Curated annotation (Swiss-Prot):
HAMAP family, per the entry: MutS (MF_00096)
Top-level taxon in the UniProt lineage: Bacteria
Residues that bind ATP: G618, P619, N620, M621, G622, G623, K624, S625
Protein's organism: Shewanella baltica (strain OS155 / ATCC BAA-1091)
Protein name in UniProt: DNA mismatch repair protein MutS
Annotated family: Belongs to the DNA mismatch repair MutS family.
GO biological process: one example: mismatch repair
Family matches, as PANTHER family: DNA MISMATCH REPAIR PROTEIN MSH1, MITOCHONDRIAL, DNA MISMATCH REPAIR PROTEIN MUTS FAMILY MEMBER
Gene that this sequence comes from: mutS
CDD domains, per the entry: ABC_MutS1
Keyword annotations from UniProtKB, A to Z: ATP-binding, DNA damage, DNA repair, DNA-binding, Nucleotide-binding
MF terms (GO), sorted A to Z: ATP binding; ATP-dependent DNA damage sensor activity; damaged DNA binding; mismatched DNA binding
Record's GO cellular component terms: cytosol
Protein purpose: This protein is involved in the repair of mismatches in DNA. It is possible that it carries out the mismatch recognition step. This protein has a weak ATPase activity.
Length: 856
């Protein structure tokens, strides 16, 4: 029962009418309805919560004549349940009691005070600290797509104009949003498969004019020209929808979202979705984070540094000036060993980026202020450490760190050393910060001394030696006397509570003091909460500068991390060349060398204008895929400013990296392994350029031998002669090793292996020239294929090789075998290609249609 007909509300009890009205306003999310110490869920929400969270499904009487399914969870455990729900993409509206049950007539007044969705989280208990938490919106135009992402936990707002479906797929893979908003008529829902937290939004939320007004109001500007995004129509529509959604869910000002940037694909090396997946940059093929490039490179000191490192990995730079600026900073940190002390200093900063977002949203907790105080207190020491460094990029970052002595002093005066988790019960504001607060606290805290004095005085006055003065939250202050001595109490003692062996009393004097103390406690807490809110007002004027401090510290963390990784893992600084090419001496795979049980065999690669394609042959398990991937990873690492696992590396300009490595069925889209392989191949052949790095592994193996060989040959030929891309082309079709004899710039290399009797030893070394054989039977034996099968295979192999040898004299050269007949010219197509449809009148178009039918 998620959509309620208001005509039916009268059938229900007053409390259920209140619940159903609120549920109708939040029909697309679970409603946590506060009742005392529990959050209750009813009807379909209860059933879903029971299933998702493993909590009991019960019933709460009847309303409207029907039993009410119900599930509940204790309020103090809500954060753990919320974490489970947002991880699976479920949104939650939290409804609290805001009225006083003692004075309420009918149901206690309630209000939805918080909406929790996967993409709008800021609470550190719900966030993955070392991963971005992105909310995305996508809008489809007549041509192309608009894409926007926002990290509410940091304020980072980015848009992109994307021309093709493939570009959108790559962006989704790169940004990996946890929640996606899409319009009602979005036509590429297949791209969203596998993403959680998908939200279908009405078309009007993407209205262009409304979006512009929203963004101008948010940024406080008259236009968007200053952001360089005024012409990004589709992505601005996506950004507008996203902004409205965040406003609706956060229900507060969003001052930390103060800028928007445009992602331009021309600024970074383009990596399509298949390449990001195949290279296992931040996620392995099983969906985890172990044994990825990020896992090897990430020894950052802060969570915000880890997040920016992953963004760098997915956005390798093309501008050599920016790359060299990072390299110079890393080199200086390494040469001076400054990275060692810097790591410890940065580690103490914590996650200032997300703390500032919570401050902006006014959801920060006392310990956030304490961490900010600590970070600001460390700034002078950090500035001193950086003052000896002269690399331009480091100097620039140092300037952005800033100094905040007034804010640090304020927090030192205001917040106790070890504040509690919440402001709810007080104890956050330091003594001496506010004299009125100290006075009210003094009245409350002096109660224990007063009670001791009162107890001694009453014992002496009454002569009752069992008399005690105490307090509990239910009955307040009391004088306790044993039942045996209760007959001795004075007349002014009024019985308050009877226990098994005791009687409890109150006196007019004690009652008056109780009211005074309880009043002082309430006033102290109210004043402390007021002072707490004022702290936000005093810190937030420096919000933008503090955000800049966080960004600069995070980037320094990554650069320091690069220096440490270079030292620890034996990486060298790559050289950047203006000439196209990739030349690597003693290159290593950054991930495999860390997990391998045996020493990793380093290998070279040489690609340049006169040597643009390598045909890579060798046995299965010989290391072909590892070799190819390491070339791509070293190239990528060089373009993020990181040192690389190689003896030496000279890297030229790269515009794209493509990989066609491995494949599996795409059952969700109904595509076979071979179809996936051919789709990825087509993407490469259409989009690769002479400045691209292309890795092609086992093209054509998903179909018949001759079909596969023909496709592999033609793809290699096209890349070598038409595109001219730098290509590593691994294959088991030995016919392709003839390509170097037929085409300039194509060379053979192979992964070496040694055969001894029926066994094989993989040398994992790259040698010039083609492999002599594939060693398939030996690899099968190593895999545990039964001996009978291996023997039968050997016999069959001898028969086939003998037949091939007999036919050697009549064999057609491979290029002739693969040559296709020249296409016959089609007069209809010739006529069609000569026409400009924009110049045709309706009558001419109709006449042309009849003519084309005749020609065909």
């Amino acid at each position: 029962m998620n959509v309620i007909d208001t005509d039916d509300l009268e059938k229900h009890t007053p409390m259920m009418r209140q619940y159903l009205t609120m549920k109708a306003e939040h029909h697309d999310m679970l409603l946590f309805y506060r009742m005392g110490d529990f959050y209750e869920l009813f009807y379909d929400d209860a059933k879903r919560a029971s299933e998702l969270l493993g909590i009991s499904l019960t019933a709460r009487g009847k309303s409207g004549g029907d039993p009410i399914p119900m599930a509940g969870l204790p309020y103090h455990a809500v954060e753990g349940y919320l974490a489970k729900l947002v991880q699976i993409g479920q949104s939650v509206a939290i409804c609290e009691q805001i009225g006083d049950p003692a004075t309420s007539k009918g149901p206690v007044e309630r209000k939805v005070v918080r909406i929790v969705t996967p993409g709008t989280l800021t609470d550190e208990a719900l966030l993955q600290e070392r991963q971005d938490n992105l909310l995305a919106a996508v809008y489809q135009g007549k041509i192309g797509f608009g894409y926007a992402t926002l990290d509410v936990s940091s304020g980072r707002f980015v848009i992109a104009e994307l021309d093709t479906r493939e570009s959108l797929e790559a962006e989704l893979q790169r940004t990996n949003p946890v929640e996606i908003l899409y319009s009602e008529d979005f036509g590429e829902l297949g791209l969203l498969n596998g993403f959680k937290g998908k939200r279908r939004r009405p078309e009007w939320e993407f209205d262009y004019d409304t979006s512009i007004k929203l963004l101008l109001a948010q940024f406080g500007t008259k236009d968007l020209h200053g952001f360089g995004i005024a012409d990004a129509r589709l992505s601005l529509q996506a950004a507008g929808c996203l902004m409205q959604y965040v406003k609706d869910t956060q229900r507060t000002a969003l001052p930390h979202i103060n800028a928007i940037t445009r992602f331009n694909q021309t600024d970074s090396i383009v990596l399509d979705a298949a390449t990001r997946r195949n290279l296992e940059l931040t996620q392995n093929l099983a969906g985890g984070r172990d044994n990825t490039l990020a896992a090897v490179l990430d020894n950052t000191a802060t969570p915000m540094g880890s997040r920016i490192l992953q963004r760098w990995i997915h956005q390798p730079l093309r501008d050599p000036k920016h790359i060299q600026a990072r390299q110079q900073a890393v080199t200086e940190l390494l040469d001076t060993a400054a990275h060692e002390g810097l790591h410890e200093q940065l580690k103490a900063l914590g996650d200032i980026e997300r703390i500032m977002a919570r401050l902006a949203l006014r959801t920060a907790r006392p310990r956030d202020f304490a961490r900010l105080r600590q970070a600001l207190g460390l700034l002078p020491e950090l500035q001193k450490s950086l003052s000896t460094l002269s690399a331009p990029h480091t100097t620039q970052l140092r300037q952005h760190l800033g100094e905040f002595p007034a804010e640090q002093a304020l927090l030192e005066r205001a917040i106790v050393d070890n504040p509690p988790m919440l402001i709810r019960d007080g104890g956050v504001i330091r003594e001496g910060y506010n004299s009125e607060l100290d006075e009210w606290r003094g009245l409350s805290e002096g109660a224990s001394d007063y009670l001791v004095q009162l107890e001694a005085r009453e014992k002496e006055r009454t002569g009752i030696n069992t008399l005690k003065v105490g307090y509990n939250r239910v009955h307040g202050y009391y004088i306790e006397v044993s039942r045996l001595q209760s007959s001795q109490v004075p007349l002014n003692y009024q019985r308050r509570q009877t226990l098994k062996n005791m009687e409890r009393y109150i006196t007019p004097e004690l009652k008056e003091y109780e009211e005074k103390v309880l009043s002082s406690q309430g006033k102290a807490l109210a004043l402390e909460k007021q002072l707490w809110e004022q702290l936000f007002d005093l810190i937030l004027p420096k919000l933008h500068e503090l955000q800049a401090f966080a960004r600069a510290a995070a980037e320094l963390d990554v650069l320091s991390n690069f220096a440490e990784r270079a030292e620890t893992l034996g990486y060298t600084c790559p050289e950047l060349s203006q000439d196209i090419g990739v030349q690597i001496e003693a290159g290593r795979h950054p991930v495999v060398e860390r997990v391998s049980q045996t020493p990793f065999i380093a290998n070279p690669v040489t690609l340049h204008n006169q040597r643009r394609m390598l045909i890579v042959t060798g046995p299965n398990m010989g290391g072909k895929s590892t070799y190819m991937r390491q070339v791509a990873l070293i190239t990528l690492m060089a373009h993020i400013g990181c040192f690389v696992p190689a003896g030496r590396a000279l890297i030229g300009p790269i515009d794209r990296i493509f990989t066609r490595i491995g494949a599996s069925d795409d059952l969700a889209s109904g595509r076979s392994t071979f179809m996936v392989e051919m789709t990825e191949t087509a993407n490469i052949l259409h989009n690769a350029t002479a400045s691209s790095l292309v890795l092609m592994d086992e093209i054509g193996r998903g179909t018949s031998t001759y079909d596969g060989l023909s496709l592999a040959w033609s793809a290699a030929e096209y890349l070598a002669q038409q595109v001219g891309a730098m290509t590593l082309f691994a294959t088991h079709y030995f016919e392709l090793t003839q390509l170097p004899e037929l085409m300039a710039g194509v060379y053979n290399v192979h992964l070496d292996a040694i055969e001894h009797d029926d066994t094989i030893a993989f040398m994992h070394t790259v040698q010039e020239g083609a492999a002599s054989k594939s060693y398939g039977l030996q690899v099968a034996a190593l895999a545990g294929v039964p001996n009978k099968v291996i023997k039968a295979a050997k016999h069959k192999l001898q028969q086939l090789e003998s037949r091939d040898h007999q036919a050697e004299g009549t064999r057609t050269p491979i290029q002739s075998l693969l040559a296709l007949p020249e296409p016959v010219e089609n007069p209809a197509l010739t006529k069609l290609s000569s026409i400009n449809p924009d110049n045709l009148t309706p009558k001419q178009a109709l006449d042309l249609l009849y003519e084309l039918k005749r020609l065909s």
